[in-house]
């Protein structure tokens, strides 16, 4: 019997030795390659962070990657660092960024996100897919969001912008002061726009599916941490194994809600035969075309597959456009309140566009607002949607002109967008809000490695024009009716602190402020 225990003990000891050797190798991975790198933390601090659930928070902070960028900038095309004990590369060179995002994109089209289309249909969206699966879906969806299609969605989005104005009016009338917490209102506006224009949730449909339920399920899908940080890392690191275990990203309750909602609305439209002017109708048209193009043995199987795919298409707008668009709107209004002279310029531009179009805010008028576009670009520079872009290599990649720098297969890459947007060598006075830095001729080649407002290259945001229309309509209507100012001079640290703005209806004359009348 003791021999059995001895053998088991030796096996356990051997396994521990192998784990220690592997961990030691991982800790020294970049040192062995002679690549400049940030040393990994010691084991006990990592364990403490895991226990206190602070590891993921640190990894998401802009300061985390900005510090590495500043420390190693100029040392080579990229530097190394570690997530737990996993080696990762932080890209430093603009030319290498262009190669990754555009020139050699075929080798870097993986965002490193976990998806499981069989067990978790909503995870199989454009945001998470890779390789040929991503390419096929992108080719199907690109035509649905081309410029001329936006004119079909204009009325739908305009109605939501008008509703935003009514919400602001009612909010101000229901309270004794003129201060509002703007990001809450912006989140509601963006969510309602997506519910109506992407999910087909109009006033009639909201009797069955109230917007409050839609908001609750959206928050559940986006912010519910179904798995802990380590398990999420495992899903990213070993996706095939996790698919065998049928692991999911989307809470089952949220998945059932969105699929049921879309199935109900799509069936109603297909039965009535009345097309609508919204994005859901464009997705239904894509689905109908696929149904004709592909032949399955069972039409029922094809229908279920395409319905789940349609739900994933719609759901990606929530994942990539809800919080991001609402936050950008909040930051734009904050910066304009902080810089009233710029707010006046945007308002005057909107006023002239309205005059040119017979007193109406038209689609053409919205597209002509060049200075507003500069303000949005500068806001996205100072307050980027995400502090970094994540990519993973599909095959080994030798960095041109740098023989010792190899991006090995399955290596995670970080492009530090926040750090690059605040690099004084690229943007002089990076902490100052200067929309006029975007007024000259645009160098698209230069911007490919220095500005990431909506992403770069083939995997840039598919809904750029949709988001731009949402942003511009809201700003045009709000600035046409209100003057925004800060009710505090305290600097904004982040949106979690809240943005409280004071709103003054244009044309209202306060005692001692007669010059504010318009």
UniProtKB/Swiss-Prot annotation:
<protein>
    <recommendedName>
        <fullName>Probable cytochrome P450 317a1</fullName>
        <ecNumber>1.14.-.-</ecNumber>
    </recommendedName>
</protein>
<keyword id="KW-0256">Endoplasmic reticulum</keyword>
<keyword id="KW-0503">Monooxygenase</keyword>
<keyword id="KW-0479">Metal-binding</keyword>
<dbReference type="InterPro" id="IPR001128">
    <property type="entry name" value="Cyt_P450"/>
</dbReference>
<dbReference type="GO" id="GO:0020037">
    <property type="term" value="F:heme binding"/>
</dbReference>
<dbReference type="InterPro" id="IPR017972">
    <property type="entry name" value="Cyt_P450_CS"/>
</dbReference>
<feature type="binding site" description="axial binding residue">
    <location>
        <position position="461"/>
    </location>
    <ligand>
        <name>heme</name>
    </ligand>
</feature>
<dbReference type="Pfam" id="PF00067">
    <property type="entry name" value="p450"/>
</dbReference>
<dbReference type="InterPro" id="IPR002401">
    <property type="entry name" value="Cyt_P450_E_grp-I"/>
</dbReference>
<dbReference type="GO" id="GO:0004497">
    <property type="term" value="F:monooxygenase activity"/>
</dbReference>
<keyword id="KW-0560">Oxidoreductase</keyword>
<dbReference type="InterPro" id="IPR036396">
    <property type="entry name" value="Cyt_P450_sf"/>
</dbReference>
<dbReference type="InterPro" id="IPR050476">
    <property type="entry name" value="Insect_CytP450_Detox"/>
</dbReference>
<dbReference type="GO" id="GO:0016705">
    <property type="term" value="F:oxidoreductase activity, acting on paired donors, with incorporation or reduction of molecular oxygen"/>
</dbReference>
<dbReference type="GO" id="GO:0005789">
    <property type="term" value="C:endoplasmic reticulum membrane"/>
</dbReference>
<comment type="similarity">
    <text>Belongs to the cytochrome P450 family.</text>
</comment>
<keyword id="KW-0349">Heme</keyword>
<dbReference type="GO" id="GO:0005506">
    <property type="term" value="F:iron ion binding"/>
</dbReference>
<keyword id="KW-0472">Membrane</keyword>
<comment type="function">
    <text>May be involved in the metabolism of insect hormones and in the breakdown of synthetic insecticides.</text>
</comment>
<keyword id="KW-0408">Iron</keyword>
<keyword id="KW-0492">Microsome</keyword>
